[in-house]
Amino acid sequence: MNEPRRDSGFFQELARRRVYRSAAAYAVFAWVAIQAGSIIFPEFGAPAWAMRALIIIFIVGFPPAMLLAWTLDFTAKGFTRTPESGYTVAKGIWPKLAIAGVTTAMSAGVLWWVWDDYIVQTRARPARALVKEQPVVAIQEPRYLAGQSEEEWLGDGIATLIRSELAESQHVIVISRARWHEIVSEASTEDEIAELARGIGIDYLIDGELFETPDGIVLTTRIEDLENGVEILSPRTSGANVSEIIEGVVQLSTEIKRALRIPHQERVGLFEADFAIENVEAYEAYIAGLAYLVDFEYQEAENAFNAALGIAPDYHIARFRLAQLYESTGRSELARATLDRIPPDANLSKRLQLYVEGAKAYFVAQRDPGKAIEVYSELVGLYPYEVEAGQLLAEAYWLDFQDSAAIDEFRRLSEIHPYDPTSWMALGERLLDVGELDEARVALEKFASMKPGDAFAFALLGNLALQQGNFDIAVERHKNALELKPDFVVARIGLARSQYLKGDAGAAESAWRSLLTDDSVAAAYRIDSAFDLAGVLRGRGQFDKALGVIEDSMPLIREEQLRAPLALSVQGSIYLDKGDAERAETLLTRAFQEAPAPPTRFLFALGMMEFRLGHATELDETIAALRLLSDSNKPDRNEDKAANYLAGLSALEENDLGSAASLLQAAVEEPGYQYRLYRTGLAMLSRAAGDLDAAAAIAFRAATERDRGDLRLDLEIDRARALLLHAEILAELGADGEAKKQARRFLDWWRDADPALPEPARARALLDD
């Protein structure tokens, strides 16, 4: 006879009735069901409360399940009532009440935690706001959750596809890839990324995770409303391989656009995604090229784009980016040839077609600023919030000498993208170029505040100080930039210019020459340095050295094309300074023949040669040709200024002082660009008229004055000659002491000048007197 034992306790009774095992099984089953629900519910469009309901059901069901486990046992014969033990007989109903009480208390606690920390908190959040008319959206590359993977590039590739799809719409502002990488470069966690995005005014952040499973790859995605702190979409995409994941991104992009309320008619052709699905390896190489390009690793980017084209020769997006790379590194002919390999019927979206068409007009080879303005205006009209399109339009205006239109476009970009430091940087840089230093300071300080410790910010502030005449500060700012980024070419050029104007010509020349011989520096910057150094050497009477600098740089200049006529013109003018009229005429004529329209600068250089050589008839023809180029509808009067200066010098030579006065005054006062220091002509006129006081004042101003918007180192030769003219006029006034002081200053400038030049002899004659 089996009598119930009386020596068992409550916990032993739980074990005998298999309550522990039942609780564990219940927990495992609930966990599996909840995990399955998290995958299945989104696929079937289940409402957000469905998952919460499932969790609550399992919590509430726990006490009844444990009571059943206490009461019933599952055997081979099915469910049977668990026999009583001595413990339960002795305790009566109390064990049942205990198990019910404990499980109910546990369930109530968990339920309260879920309710208070999740459901109530969720309900307490602000309701999802309506999507803004033009929301600002950033796309963060999905992260791989399980460490390294052979497909690490895929997150970047997915983000690029989504970014490209959204950028095709007029109804959303998409943060560019390069700009987004700048924003999150210092962030290490998801919270930091979201906080940085929220801090600069981004409305929605799209991010997610990638992980590999035995069946393939899974991509989870989220759209976070950063302002309201809610998640508005969390789709899930899976595929057996990379191609299937990329194909899933097509549908994902549609869901994202729907969530952002992008109108149906604005949905984009899936050109890039379609190509990537069929050419995964080429797309991987293309993504690598973009990453290298962001980091200015041009050779690696070039290799990657060429690899993409080697795999898929009709990958025209990669071809377009390769052409841009060639153009930015000074290989204009190659850039144009690469663009020409993109057929008119290439399978590109309208947006990308316009970028290609605009580049054909914008690139140096066969440049047509008017056509570029037309194409980029259409692009901006279709996509008014796209930063790259607006910046290209502004630069096209700049190339067409429409400075005001260019700056207005940069202002527009800074107004609609106030969160973007590059908009403030571009605006400040162009304002510096036109001498609007006060507004430039505001823009550059805004840029610097958004990018503290940035090398480019220091360099531009150094350029601002340089143009303000604060040379010590300029040197310091450029050195700050180089401490942060030792090879930063903008700061290297700025430091050379600052050192020169501060009076340290030796250090400046060394800096320029180091740029000229540095193959890692982009060709455009090396050419800038060549013209800077040639202008300074010419201004100090070192004509042979100046010619050598230009001659050594001609391979780069010829490859770039744009400044080849300018180089010929500079060489011809220097040979004219040296008295070699034959070579001067040959070079200046070639410069004019190769010049792009309008050839104002090169006609003027020919006119100066004709004046110096006394070729009056040819000079009159050149002046007439300049006047024919004048356009009364344009605000600048470059052609009229140049013609008036040449005609004024000719009248002065013929002693027609009345005509010379009106012509030279107009040359100085009319708005526009000057190809020489026209004010020197006025000083010569006043001297010829016997007004020596006025002549001295004008000559001094010509020797010392600099344009706030342009340092014009090419005019150093005119400043030196104006200084010598000032010294001679002072001597005629009887101010011998001051005349000798200015003569010594000139001779100090020209201490290394080429021998047998007439100017040093004139200065020494003043000292002898």
Which residue ranges define each predicted feature?
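An N-terminal, helix-rich hydrophobic module
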Residues: M1-D117, D314
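Helix-start (N-cap) detector for alpha-helical repeat units in TPR-like alpha-solenoids
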Residues: A282, H316-I317, S349-L352, P369, ...
